[in-house]
Amino acid sequence: MQKIIISILHYNNSKDTINCLKSLTGLVLSGLEIETFVLDNGSKDGLTLNISDFSKINLTVLKNPKNSGFTGGHNLVYEKVQDKEFDFFLLLNNDSIMESHCLKILTEKMDTNGIGAVVPKIYFTKGMEFHKNKYEKNELGKVFWYAGGYVDWNNVQSKHRGVDEVDKGQYDEECEIDFATGACLLLKKEVIRQIKLFDERYFLYFEDADLSQRILKAGYKILFEPKAILWHNNAGSSGSGSSLHDYYLTRNRMLFGMKHASLKMKAHLVRESIKLLTTGRQWQKKGIQDFYLQKFGAGSFRP
């Protein structure tokens, strides 16, 4: 029997969190035992759950009086459970729905030699596609949000393979990747013990790209497994294209690049950052300023 700890962060989005948990109760768990932790990450919407409704997934709700971000929230859950006996730690976004065999398939792939992390094929939730009007009705729910990921080192960006494409079998081969999204990421406990979980300086965005690079540098492989399927609402708690995006993506791209990019790209990032200080949007400028001031974590952002 293999044991999995599932870590879910809740932030002002009760409907999504409840739907996510309901999907977990339908998982095929033969040979698996799961324990699920929902961390209320400083939210104000009064998450109320009937724990007895989720006995199959052994649910525990934790309260965090402040919003510690994606990084701090998952780190808090891991700190809570690190002394327990378990094999795998699953990071799961609360605006996600797991297909019933998803977790079983992911864990089976962990038996492959050298694999330290596995991610599934992820679709946009039906009706939540970026450009839903351009698809046929029968294509909705089959549009990729993520079909594996990679780091574009020429631009220092973490990229989703296949995003906005309809699934026509073009990404049906499992493969090794160098960027695993934190939306649904299964990790071996031994990996976290060796490299730790998230660098809390990121707060949110680029934290999963940073974790991926540390996994690879520790000698482990990251596997994309297309037979495992998940649906994701996309930016359910942050909102795509927002000032929040401007701030954290700008600041954290600098942090990620200075940690992991080549010397040539580091020099390019410095030049680009100087330009952004004069031509960027308000929160892009603030993100650059805070990077140089080493103001990380939640930083200066205020909605």
Model-derived features: positions:
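A conserved acidic beta->alpha catalytic loop
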Residues: S23, L39-L49, K66
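A recurrent flexible, glycine/aromatic-enriched loop bordering the glycosyltransferase active site
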Residues: N154-H160, V166-L187, A209
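Short beta-strand-to-loop acidic/aromatic patch adjacent to the donor-nucleotide binding site
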Residues: E85-I97
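Short, acidic, metal-binding catalytic loop of nucleotide-sugar glycosyltransferases
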Residues: K22-E33
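Conserved donor NDP-sugar-binding/catalytic core segment of glycosyltransferases
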Residues: I97-V143, Y150-N154
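Glycine-rich, basic loop-to-helix element that forms the pyrophosphate-binding segment
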Residues: K63-Q82
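Non-catalytic, C-terminal membrane-associated alpha-helical segments of glycosyltransferases
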Residues: L244-M254, M258-P303
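A short, conserved alpha-helix in the catalytic core of glycosyltransferases
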Residues: D178-I229
